[in-house]
């Protein structure tokens, strides 16, 4: 669970 924009 990192930044919202990194959801691959």
Swiss-Prot record:
- Could you give one GO CC term from the UniProt record? extracellular region
Q: Where are the transmembrane segments?
A: none
Q: Which UniProt keywords apply?
A: Amidation, Neuropeptide, Secreted
Q: What is its main location?
A: secreted
Location of this chain's protein in the cell: Secreted
Q: Name one GO biological process term.
A: neuropeptide signaling pathway
Asked if Mitochondrion is a keyword of the record, the answer is: no
* Positions of modified residues (Phenylalanine amide): 8
Question: What family does the Swiss-Prot or TrEMBL record give for this protein?
Answer: Belongs to the FARP (FMRFamide related peptide) family.
Record's protein name: FMRFamide-like neuropeptide AF7
Species this protein is from? Ascaris suum
């Amino acid at each position: 669970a990192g930044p919202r924009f990194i959801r691959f």
